């Protein structure tokens, strides 16, 4: 515990290095500032803002809903040991780290971030297909592949949507753009994680009690129900983000000379 506290202190001190300097000429009390409502109205009048936020919310929810049920699924349905289920988290994190590297490579080449985000959603569809079919095939390896691809697809989607937000013509409202991204991302993620657990519990209770029919009397039914919802949410994400790819035909100018994990606020 003391080691964690000391590490946190050191990391916070390091984070203060090169912190953005104050700009009194922009933050003085004498400068007239519009209300949040006026600022948001101006910001939302950009044609693709609301569609972007809807796509972000759907995609984030799709990748987050499985967060607290992935390991129990491996243990309860596939009979994995405690150590084997712990590895699932490592696989998901490894997939996300690999996605960050891939995103850095292609975004620095000015690839359309919306297109890359849609590719992340496609990987998510493949991931949940692997997870869903791992139960009838009794294949822990297929399940592990699904866990890895969830991290990879989610990583691509998160970084790409953040880069897209940073590339908005915000007219001096960069903080609002990133704040909107963070608010939608955090809200969608929190609601989805909670909903995933509740849906799994409710459906599992109904299924094991026989209220859903004899064919669905299985411990896997509740989990499968959640994974199918995520599957459909990813299709909805593709529908929402598709027009953004069309609207953004020209390559997006790279918004930063560097790309790293420090650019991902969550």
Describe the role of every protein-language-model region.
Residues 98-115:
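Helix-to-loop junctions at the C-terminal end of transmembrane segments
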Residues 156-170:
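Intracellular juxtamembrane helix-capping segments at the cytosolic ends
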Residues 1-5, 201-233:
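A membrane-interface helix-boundary motif in multi-pass transporters
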